Amino acid sequence: MNISSRIKKNLAFYLLAAVFAFAPLCNADAQSDDNEFGIWTTLEASKKINKKLKLDFEAELRTIEGVGDIERVSLGAGASYKFTKWLKASAGYIFIYSHSLEEKKPKTDDPLIIDGIGTFYDYNVDHAYWTERHRFHLSLTGEYKIGRVELSLRERLQYTRTNSAVTDESKYRWHQQFDADFNEIEPTLELKETAPELKETKYNTTLRSRLTAKWDIAKCKVTPFASVELYTRLDDWKGCDKMRYRIGASYKINKDNSVSLFYMYQDANDDDEPKGHAIGLGYSIDL
């Protein structure tokens, strides 16, 4: 092995190590900034029908709060068609079984204010529940190579239906208390009631614009990559809803098998995922 090849392979190793090193840092940052941290694991399989047409299958499991809770499980299938060397189109369907964690919702109106003691807000608690989502997507991807760097821009239009679900809502209320001399003291918190709550069906149409850069290192099985993705909701236009950033690398085991590792940060909450960080692990196979 010559010096140049050794440098390239060492560089690839350090890039992978850097992604691993992000994990504990991300978790600490997530806890301090009220962001979430999770692990995303993906299994992908593809079958080439001919030079232009390919079928794709995907299964994914995501956790939240580290590995404490499952956030969602999904299964997807799709197809892509390559028009030219640099342009392809794809379409697919994803079934998502999503877990909404328990949520505390403070009531900011009419708080109980006690001088010298504090301000106390009533609140409601939505209990955890599962719901089904059906997602359809259409994509157009263009690719362009600059030396050993491949740039790609994917524009994806996705439509998501989130089915209705029933959960329980608990209402907690503060009650004013007095001592024997009728002085206000620490109030007591009581559960007023727990009743079923209907989460109505939701519809979401979003445009996702993702720019990706891959570095093809000569004579090396590791391919570093980075991407930035912009989400724009079309049925409730407010400009850019969120940004998602990824950095990672893939490793080609052999002709048909590869694994990948990445770090992801998302800068805003939405109906799909919470704001926060994730470490992703993936396995891909060509059938």
Indicate residue ranges for each PLM-predicted region:
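Residues on the lipid-exposed face of transmembrane beta-strands in outer-membrane beta-barrel proteins
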Residues: T41-K47, A77-Y81, L138-G142, L157, ...
